[in-house]
Amino acid sequence: MKRSLHLTFVCLSLFSARMCVQGNQFNIEVSRSNKLSLPGFENLTAGYNKFLRPNFGGEPVQIALTLDVASISSISESNMDYTATIYLRQRWTDQRLVFEGNKSFTLDARLVEFLWVPDTYIVESKKSFLHEVTVGNRLIRLFSNGTVLYALRITTTVACNMDLSKYPMDTQTCKLQLESWGYDGNDVEFSWLRGNDSVRGLENLRLAQYTIQQYFTSVTRSQQETGNYTRLVLQFELQRNVLYFILETYVPSTFLVVLSWVSFWISLDSVPARTCIGVTTVLSMTTLMIGSRTSLPNTNCFIKAIDVYLGICFSFVFGALLEYAVAHYSSLQQMAAKDRGKAKEVEEVNITNIINSSISSFKRKISFASIEISGDNVDYSDLTMKTSDKVKFVFRDKLGRIVDYFTIQNPSNVDRYSKLLFPLIFMLANVFYWAYYMYF
């Protein structure tokens, strides 16, 4: 019996001590230089219902926001999103938290659970989290007139629709939108505290591939099935730094095009040298094109500006290889034609000699009284040609002229014209390319 009473006494003592500790935690008093004692949190929130908004049933709560952008850690073209760390600060007035004096005091972040706070969320956010090191990165500050300051440190990944048709000379416009999840415009009204000056930190950011050109804030309305909501919008423009891509892709591809032109100054007879240059430049351009497309694996549905330029360079490199094939083939054809001409001349001389010898022999063996056969006065007027033979002769003559018209008479002129036309056309293509993608 005594043991039972002893255990009961110990339990009551421990419970009393526990209640005293909890009471001390909620009895918050802040002393200023003038020794003003602020009310305890427990007394201030007596009868407070955190499940009801301020002015419940009356005017909507006016919530003013400010935003500090600490960092933009990544911008993904493949996933079309960006990841940013922000400091979000919200201010509103809750008349239930008015106390005497003109001072303010900061509460432990864990006491936020006992107050009403807005259900603000980030529109189009894929994932977000509140920092918890070393404690939850939240701040709650009460002012004597009932104003509440609620600050959070959040890292969020937000969707950003990107148009990559001008990549890498593109400028992307991304948004950060804030809205109440459950309270519509009849309960909560959001606003920027100081307009564009409500957002800070963007002008100081240094990004790897982008430069922040400008940003501005706005307030819009979001009409949804559950009501009409106030939406705060931060819109900022990101201009890509093209210098990196010029050094990585544009300069090497241009050098490969120029390298392919070296073959124009090599003799047509140097088949291995010209073939090696042509094949090497084509393979190198193919590698560049594959590397460019694999760097953005999920954006291959876009025909990007860099793809257009690499396509132009590949056309010129492949064209230089085809130019040698045409010139070399024409050279072989010309040599074959010369050989055929010489053989034909020899054949004609042989035929003429045979005919002349045959006529001379015929003259000696046969003689006619009324006809004198002579090589000079033979009349061929009675020899006629059939109509079908005439048609074949005319057709062959026309076909031969057409073939001669498209046949390169001097293959060395192919290289001579290519030395001028290839660089000239490539320069014009560059002028149109850069003018279009930089200014249109």
Curated annotation (Swiss-Prot):
Any single GO BP term: chloride transmembrane transport
Keywords assigned by UniProt, alphabetized: Cell membrane, Chloride, Chloride channel, Disulfide bond, Glycoprotein, Ion channel, Ion transport, Membrane, Signal, Transmembrane, Transmembrane helix, Transport
Membrane topology designation: Multi-pass membrane protein
Cysteines paired by S-S bonds: 160-174
GO molecular function, one term: GABA-A receptor activity
Signal sequence, start to end: 1-23
Localization: Cell membrane; Apical cell membrane
Reaction catalysis annotation: chloride(in) = chloride(out)
Chain segments annotated as transmembrane: 242-262, 271-290, 302-322, 420-440
One Pfam family from the record: Neur_chan_LBD
Glycosylation sites: 43, 102, 145, 196, 228
Extracellular side, ranges: 24-241, 291-301
One GO CC term, this protein: chloride channel complex
Topology, Cytoplasmic side: 263-270, 323-419
Record SUPFAM superfamilies: Neurotransmitter-gated ion-channel transmembrane pore (SSF90112), Nicotinic receptor ligand binding domain-like (SSF63712)
UniProt-listed InterPro entries: GABAA/Glycine_rcpt, GABAAp_rcpt, GABAAR_pi_TM, Neur_chan_lig-bd, Neur_chan_lig-bd_sf, Neur_channel, Neuro-gated_channel_TM_sf, Neuro_actylchol_rec
Main location: membrane
Protein task: Pi subunit of the heteropentameric ligand-gated chloride channel gated by gamma-aminobutyric acid (GABA). GABA-gated chloride channels, also named GABA(A) receptors (GABAAR), consist of five subunits arranged around a central pore and contain GABA active binding site(s) located at the alpha and beta subunit interfaces. When activated by GABA, GABAARs selectively allow the flow of chloride anions across the cell membrane down their electrochemical gradient. Pi-containing GABAARs are mostly located in peripheral tissues.
Membership in a protein family: Belongs to the ligand-gated ion channel (TC 1.A.9) family. Gamma-aminobutyric acid receptor (TC 1.A.9.5) subfamily. GABRP sub-subfamily.
Subunit structure as annotated in this protein's UniProt entry: Heteropentamer, formed by a combination of alpha (GABRA1-6), beta (GABRB1-3), gamma (GABRG1-3), delta (GABRD), epsilon (GABRE), rho (GABRR1-3), pi (GABRP) and theta (GABRQ) chains, each subunit exhibiting distinct physiological and pharmacological properties.
UniProt note: domains: GABAARs subunits share a common topological structure: a peptide sequence made up of a long extracellular N-terminal, four transmembrane domains, intracellular or cytoplasmic domain located between the third and the fourth transmembrane domains.
Protein name: Gamma-aminobutyric acid receptor subunit pi
